[in-house]
Amino acid sequence: MIRYIKEKEVAQILTMPKAVELVEAALRERTTGRAIDIPRSRTRIPAGTLQMMQAASPALQRIGFKVYYTGSSKITSYYVQLFDSESGKLEAIIEANYLGMMRTGAASGVATRYMAREDAAVLAMIGAGKQAVGQLEAVCAVRKINEVRVYSRDIEKARAFCTKMSGKLGVKMHAVASIAETVRGADVINVITKASAPALLGEWLAPGQHINAAGANSFVRRELDAAAVQRCARVAVDSRATARIECGDLLPLIDKGLLDWDALPELGEIIAGRVPGRENRDEITLFESQGMAIEDIYTAKYVVDTAREKNIGIDLPIGD
């Protein structure tokens, strides 16, 4: 029967350290040819857009997709459907808002592990929305962070985020009134916004910083200006195929001949040791995250296996 797993049940199962482990494995397996990822497809109508991401892991014997619809509603519902690739049977349907937030954060955690300085201790957060939770938790999972600065256009939102997350993580956090002040002296910078104009400027960056940019997964979005990207000695993407379609931070520079796709490694290539993530302490490094279905599939497989083991979720009265 098909297991149905709700958001709150996913949250019971999936921790950030486990999500980081799973996403790292997914990216490594794809790079070494043992997993397949298909870039996001979009079907647009006047009222909104249906978005679908597909991936497969022959090693896990799983294939599946994530689907969601973005329209005028402020609420977007994400679902992962996971199939057994040997039997062809639908194994599970998972409510995937929480899962998506965790795996997106985990990708930044993996990038931080391989690209940030090992002694990174100060984290700057640009953005304090729902996705910021995963970004914060992931960096704290891979580095000994002792200070977090948070910027939001609504400073009260930033303060509320600090209050909530400092108690959960046991880390000193405070809201900051400007982006420039937020990133000054930071070792790692997380940018997770829906900005259409650059939020992070190159003039604010300092040697040795690492940046995770996870919000510009559309050609109409920009989180970094051209100067910020050009100051980075190493710019990595999760998927070149996907970034070519939708990376709003990089496409303008590519179009002007200021960047070359062939010079931008994928994070999986760094994980596999084919390319260094950082060559010295003074380099500024950047990870551009678009999101990949293979991250969803690896994470979903773990969630489903754990749910069955612990009798979490319900079996739908359909299928064999």
Q: What positions do the PLM features span?
A:
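N-terminal ligand-binding/catalytic initiation module
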Residues: 1-101, 109, 119, 265, ...
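Adenosine-phosphate binding glycine-rich loop
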Residues: 9, 221-320
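Short helix-loop-beta connector
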Residues: 115-122, 144, 206-207
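Conserved beta-strand elements of the Class I
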Residues: 123-124, 285
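Glycine-rich Rossmann-fold phosphate-binding loop(s) that bind the pyrophosphate
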Residues: 128-129
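N-terminal Rossmann-fold NAD(P) dinucleotide-binding loop
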Residues: 132-133
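NAD(P)-binding Rossmann-fold cofactor-contacting core
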Residues: 141-168
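Rossmann-like adenosine-cofactor binding region
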Residues: 170-255
